[in-house]
Curated annotation (Swiss-Prot):
This is Uncharacterized protein C25B2.08. The lineage of its organism: Eukaryota, Fungi, Dikarya, Ascomycota, Taphrinomycotina. Residues 1-35, 44-63 are annotated as: Disordered. Residues 1-33 have a biased composition (Polar residues). One of its GO terms (cellular component) is nuclear envelope. Residues 53-63 have a biased composition (Basic residues).
């Protein structure tokens, strides 16, 4: 624990009983010595503060991986198609005008063509 954090933990020391109310009695701390910060019981609620969620640059960890625009577009199209397929399978089966593999291949070819901005030539095998 860093020395400049001691004051915040000693201030929150009185709230330990309130923070640990949801725990089972075996997990409750028996005694907390506020003078010695190494013996403080740090609950999971305190560990989930935004200070711990952020990296050193101040950006959240899960936003550090950036994807390109075209990949996001393809991703949303692809998973949208999968979601539509699931909904169609769950619904009452009707007469299929187009079989699902052909539908998937043509839509993926169209999606790739719109991403690359090239015309679709021929059929996607």
């Amino acid at each position: 624990m860093l020395p400049h954090q001691n004051s915040s933990y000693t201030r929150q020391g009185t709230n330990d009983a309130q923070a640990n109310d949801m725990r089972s009695p075996s997990q409750l701390p028996t005694s907390v010595n506020i003078e010695d910060p190494s013996k403080l019981c740090i609950s999971s609620e305190k560990l989930n503060t935004p200070m711990h969620n952020r990296s050193r640059s101040g950006i959240k960890k899960h936003t550090s991986v950036k994807r390109s625009r075209s990949f996001k577009l393809f991703d949303t199209l692809f998973f949208g198609i999968l979601r539509l397929r699931k909904q169609r399978i769950r619904s009452v089966k009707k007469v299929r005008s187009i079989s699902s593999p052909v539908l998937i291949s043509t839509t993926s070819a169209l999606a790739l063509a719109t991403i690359e901005q090239q015309p679709v030539i021929g059929e996607c095998s």
